[in-house]
Amino acid sequence: MSSIRVKQYDALIVGAGGAGLRAALEMAQSRQYKVAVVSKVFPTRSHTVSAQGGIAAALGNVVPDKPIWHMFDTVKGSDYLGDQDAIQYMCEQAPPSVYELEHYGLPFSRLDDGRIYQRAFGGHTRDFGKEMARRTCACADRTGHAMLHTLYQKNVEAGTHFYYEWYGIDLVRGAQGGIAGMIAMNMETSELVFFKSRATIFATGGAGRIYETTSNAYTNTGDGIGMVLRAGLPVQDMEFWQFHPTGIYGVGCLITEGARGEGGYLINKDGERFMERYSPHLKDLDCRDVVARSILQEVMAGGGVGPKKDHVLLKLDHLGEKVLRERLPGIIELSEKFANVDITKEPIPILPTCHYMMGGIPTNIHGQALTVDENGKDQIIEGLFAAGECACVSVHGANRLGTNSLLDLVVFGRAIGLHLEEALKTELKHRSENPDDIDAAIARLKRWEKPNNVENPALLRQEMRKAMSEDFGVFREEQKMKQGLERLQKLNERLQRAKLTDTSRTFNNARIEALELDNLMEVSYATAVSAQQRTESRGAHSRYDYKERDDANWLKHTVYFRDGHIAYRPVNMKPKGMDPFPPKSRD
């Protein structure tokens, strides 16, 4: 085994977004455990900062609401692929989780009576779909920003140890099974360190950078997914990628669904509010997969605007400048900067943009990572946990409802912390590491400096994103996906011959981007293989050649292993103390 420095902790959190900070805080506040957070960016620059719309919770501050209505909407929104035990837990924990954030100091927008302001959001209804709910707790249109700063400050108070600008290279398995920790690199010096931990928690976020147009930050490169797959562990439901309906045309930056929740609506070239045709009941506030497909169908039918007739418009000016500046100040700024549009006077050009990864590392409601044994049974991976976008509990199924993402972060980040407070007392011990994993991580680093390698990693990344966008976008079909998989296979062969031109050791961003490319390719492969084998349309996975949902054959989770093997897990239809919501049409 290669000799590298070792740092030892009770719990190691990888990623400093909402999920990572919430998990860290739960343990650090107990003052019982040594907790470290490793992040490749400063914590308040994590991607949670870009979440605009709010966090869902059935508080009933504006109109009466119930957690069971929230649960119904989430199950239906997931196109019935969400696990109902996990969804029930999340929706019931939503109100106390929001009040907890309020007590931490998160500056929510307020109603006149001082209670938390709540706005309407797509797919959220009252009384099992009868009318729109006001469920989204908002801090203007910067809720994620406020949450991240609040949680970071509380972690500083609690004494959490931060390693920011450190990059996770690979997991280290235990010699007798389980996970012993992770190899990470100090981005400032390129020093490698083995973080040995009793519990390793992945909160590494999404991987939207596999697509050309995305709302995701440059840092969202699927690092946790790549590390898990290289460790021989599976990921789940990777065919499901949410394309947010309202990305700024040509850029991909997000216009929050809260803009439509406040009363904005989509129009075509004739100024028609076309969502009234596609979704007469919920209109512009239908589920995101429905609205995104409707926009593209409208464009293909000739309703597009602009010189290329290839996008539509989001109208907000009718709301008035006072409302816009009070409720959507960030959108005013974004639109001016990236679309050169004054939303108080004119509509915003928009087109769907890759936004969210519904799949990820399979877990239970305690955040414990799972694999599937040869008999198809769930097996807990000792010492490994996951929460947030890199995890698949699964509360989002085939399509996520807006504002359930921030809720997912805090509920399951907290759940991991609560579980570990007890598990670290008795169950979880330090494991002897597998030396081969440390050697393999070092070899992966050295591969990029082989003198005979010639391929440019930056060009390979461009070609990969182009292949994913063209062959695995909003609409899919067999021949295109087969073509896309062949393109990825050739790119992967070239990737093994890629070379760094800059081999310096100090803040070498080219080295980090090359390592990220390994992870992006792992995510792309998982997406491509999973998408090709699911012969139905469900939620965000929409196929021209299989247009209907097929519950008889496909009401199950796909579990992908790195060798291309696909296993399956049943959807959990057993909420506690109540009957499940049976699959129905979402029309």
UniProtKB/Swiss-Prot annotation:
Family matches, as PROSITE patterns: FRD_SDH_FAD_BINDING
Keywords, comma-separated and alphabetical: Cell inner membrane, Cell membrane, Electron transport, FAD, Flavoprotein, Membrane, Oxidoreductase, Transport, Tricarboxylic acid cycle
Catalytic reaction annotation: a quinone + succinate = fumarate + a quinol
Single GO MF annotation: flavin adenine dinucleotide binding
Residues reported to bind FAD: 15-20, 39-54, 223, 389, 405-406
Pathway info: Carbohydrate metabolism; tricarboxylic acid cycle; fumarate from succinate (bacterial route): step 1/1
GO annotation (BP), single: tricarboxylic acid cycle
SUPFAM superfamilies recorded: FAD/NAD(P)-binding domain, Succinate dehydrogenase/fumarate reductase flavoprotein C-terminal domain, Succinate dehydrogenase/fumarate reductase flavoprotein, catalytic domain
Modification type Tele-8alpha-FAD histidine: residues: 47
Cofactor(s) the record lists: FAD
Record-listed substrate binding positions: 244, 256, 355, 400
Cellular component aspect of the GO annotation: plasma membrane
Catalytic residues (UniProt): 288 (proton acceptor)
Subunit record text: Part of an enzyme complex containing four subunits: a flavoprotein, an iron-sulfur protein, cytochrome b-556 and a hydrophobic protein.
Family: Belongs to the FAD-dependent oxidoreductase 2 family. FRD/SDH subfamily.
PANTHER family: SUCCINATE DEHYDROGENASE 2 FLAVOPROTEIN SUBUNIT, SUCCINATE DEHYDROGENASE [UBIQUINONE] FLAVOPROTEIN SUBUNIT, MITOCHONDRIAL
NCBIfam families per UniProt: sdhA_forward, sdhA_frdA_Gneg
Protein's name in the database: Succinate dehydrogenase flavoprotein subunit
Lineage: Bacteria, Pseudomonadati, Pseudomonadota, Gammaproteobacteria, Legionellales
